[in-house]
Amino acid sequence: MMKWVFALFFLLIFDVDVSAQVDPHFSQYYAYALWMNPALAGATQMDYRATLIHRNQNFGNVNTFSTSGLSAEMTTNQNINIGLNVLSQTATSGGYGYLNGALSLAYTGVKLGYNEDYNITFGMTVGFLNRRFDPSRFQLGDQYEPGVGFTPLLPSADNFNNAASTVLDAGAGIAFFDTNPLKRANFYAAFSMNHLTQPEDPFVDSQGKLRLPVRYLVNAGVSLKLGNDMVLIPHVLYARQGNAQERMAGLYLTIPYGETSELIAGGNIRFKDAIVPYAGFTFNNFTLGMSYDINPALRSSGTSTNTFEISLTFFKRKSGNYRGVRCPVF
């Protein structure tokens, strides 16, 4: 199984046409698993987990994008895991807003192999998608006075009859885990489709209605057990939404210290976009992760860009002999 992950890794490296994402995204995407795939709800070595993640993007001295996510998930004894997810993004200092909330259910009853080491989970998510903008923050052509410039008190003849929209949103996914505790390498992979309802763009006046494209996402990785209880996890992600696509590959290492603590260090590459080093630590029931996007293309052109991301996860570990594959958790 592991050879397929490395094959996909090299495919990502040599085929790197990347466009801007339609949906918001995170560099620490595994800290916010429900954003990727509802089948990942509860797919951890934990009874429950709650994560708060925040991403701040600045270009020059302008605060361009601010994105926050909150998720909570729990396992049950009925082969059903439950998750709740909320994502919010504001752009241009609050001029545009994107809010997505959803409830996820994952069925975990498919277990294959002699010892039921191969687990397949199916997930679905249903929620809402709200998009809005604030017309008062626009600078319109008829609000400019010759010799004066932009005059915000000058009324505009442009009318905005539809400044907000809330619609039904839905998605589905599937995930595979090799949970054999005797193996040195455990493989996992997942596939999801989001925005299956393809809601119309509420702000574009067009004869042919524009719709939000379905987002297809594939992620995979291998949990490699090293000596002294260290774990190395290479992982990849590919997302496509309309003509936009994102390819990421990375790895990270966990180094235990004490009984309930570990250090985390690694990095991602978002091809033709950014290099993302990150670090974190786990202490008792908390994990803190931090990352910083370095964009070589913008820096070489003299444009100042700063993208910082931080995540905080609270969890309760599973008791007993739980056989779960170690997935990236920042």
Locate predicted features:
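Positively charged n-region of N-terminal signal peptides that target proteins for export
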Residues: 1-5, 111-113
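Sec/Tat signal peptide C-region and signal peptidase I cleavage site
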Residues: 4, 14-20
